[in-house]
Amino acid sequence: MRALVLSGGGAKGAYQAGALNYILGEKFRHYDLFAGVSVGALNALSLAQYKKGNEDQACMVLDHLWSNISTAQVYHDRTPFGFLSIVSEPSLYSTDPLRKMIASGFDAAKLAHSGKQLRMVAVDLITAEKRVWTEKTPDLISGALASCSFPLAFEPVPAPPGSYCTDGGVRDSTPLGEAIRAGATEVDVILCECEKIGPWKKEERALSIGPRVLGIMAAEIFEDDLKIAMLYNDLVGHAKHSKKRPVKINVMRPSSNLLDNPLDFSQDKSRVNMRRGYEDA
């Protein structure tokens, strides 16, 4: 079973769309499972709705979404008072536009009949545990929204009932482990950060510092996940009479740093990141 694992990265998710234009649209590579965290969950949810053989349609949908996206389609200020809303509101921005965008592109019947598996990861602030949505979990729209609810900027999502879920990147930069547990024998991973994170243009604002910190954390978490996966392969390879097989892991990441602000969904920057993804693929 082959899986595609998509990392978080906010507006840098356009890079994944560009890469998949080549991988799905020109190489016609197919996947049995799509797993994502944060913006990767949004892309995974879109892709999982298409049957084998319809990969070109899937990448056309992603291409249209990311080529025409705008910040207004993702979030807006909660109040006219900007940062003062943090005092009385659960987040700086409202993601009502993002929920509408997710809902407009989601067809539960298509997903149910696609034959594809899905994994989306968020973190429950109440229990500090991971929440995983599969293709069979109710309310996948809320699951996708929860997975990309960047702390402080976006409001946590009360789904499932009794929980309060935020960006899955807090615990998992990529759901590599979820793909392996689901039975994947080959995993393609598309990251939104290059191997060496570039220098930062210092900005003394919380919404600039926060994404920078999360990006550094995510890079470290993925490297740890990859080391664990390689250790798993070594153990399986040396185990006698084991029914488990080593997992082939292919990692793609930007050849150089992408345009930096993960909350900037402007169309021109999105298209630049898409072009970078296509070229790197």
Residue ranges and their predicted role:
Residues R2-V5, G10-I102, T134-A146, L191, ...:
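Patatin-like phospholipase
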Residues Y75-I190, K196, K240-A281:
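Active-site-adjacent alpha/beta core region of enzyme catalytic domains
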Residues E186-S242:
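Helix-centered, glycine/charged polyanion-binding patches within enzymatic domains
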Residues K51-K52, R205-S208, D268:
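Short, hinge-like loop/turn segments at secondary-structure boundaries
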Residues K27-F28, K52, A184, E204, ...:
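Residue-level recognition of short, well-ordered coil/turn positions
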Residues Q57, V61, P97, M101, ...:
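Exposed alpha-helical structural elements
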Residues L20-N21, T137-P138, R181, E204-L207:
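Short, solvent-exposed amphipathic alpha-helical segments in soluble enzyme
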